[in-house]
Amino acid sequence: MKEKKFVSAVAYLYNDEDSVLEFLKSLDGYLFEKFEHYEIILVNDRSTDRTVGIIDENKKLLNSESVIILNLAWRHGLEPAMLAGTEMSIGDYVFEFDSTAIDYTFETLNEIYDKAANGFDIVGAYPDGPQKTTSKLFYAFLKKVSYLNLELTTENLKIVSRRALNRVLDLREKTRYRKALYRYSGFPCASVKYTPVKTAARAKRSLSERVSLAADVIFAFSDLGMKISIILSTLFFMLSLGIGFYAIVIYLTLKTVVTGWTTLSLFLSCGFSGIFLVLGILGKYLTMLLTEVQNRPSYIVRSVERINKND
């Protein structure tokens, strides 16, 4: 018997012409067999290949009559793109696929859905095996400095309940990092480990994208930036005081001192001490102000296409 719950599946697309057809057929087949009602939302992050064309050419192979392609105006990246897709979704549960690469089985999808239906609002799935060194270091560092000691890992897919998704969508965070935001939602979370059935080539971010995302996440979900500012301000303040004290000692102990040296040193010492203290205070207020006033949209949609297999 099919499940009565309405589910949405949101998938990220970017230059996936080699894998999108297999992914879409597999996903559609699974949802058709498992649920009475479902929708598939494909977020096209300004692909430059034939990703969308392949979907349109093979639409008659699909069972669903509710396949939506969300075309973004320019390349936004994974997190803003998935935000666009999840905001459009209407399902009681929402599957999120960060890639069209398939290295899991339907059993994995069943397992995360069953956990979600039995009390866990956010359930992620991650492959068994060693993580990339860079990812491992990033997650360990984020756990150390984040507000809630976030324990994150590389998740390839997840399912989220409607109430958890609504809470996360209501957050005013401009840095949208779903893994952290779901943990901050306060709802029960769980993870499922699966054994990859094959090696799947996953979409790769450029180095600059990864570094930018890592920096945004660390500074958005911790007070590391403020701590660094305060520590540096304090160090330079103490250094300036030390130089001022040294200038006074030199003036009192040496018989001959270069004219104006003491006055200049004291002036620079006091001046820079004040500047560094003020910079530390301003840094705090600027951080707070920027968080409040930056109200730019997280994504821009160019068009929405509804794929109808009967057309």
Say what each PLM segment does:
Residues 19-21, 49-58:
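Acidic helix N-cap motif at the loop->helix transition within catalytic regions
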Residues 44-52, 101-102:
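A conserved acidic beta->alpha catalytic loop
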Residues 36-47, 70-71:
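Short beta-strand/loop segment that forms part of the nucleotide-sugar
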Residues 107-122:
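Conserved donor-nucleotide/metal-binding helix-loop-beta segment in metal-dependent transferases, i.e.
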Residues 163-224:
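Catalytic donor/gating beta->alpha subdomain of glycosyltransferases that bind UDP-sugars
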Residues 1-29:
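N-proximal low-complexity "stem/linker" segments adjacent to membrane-targeting elements
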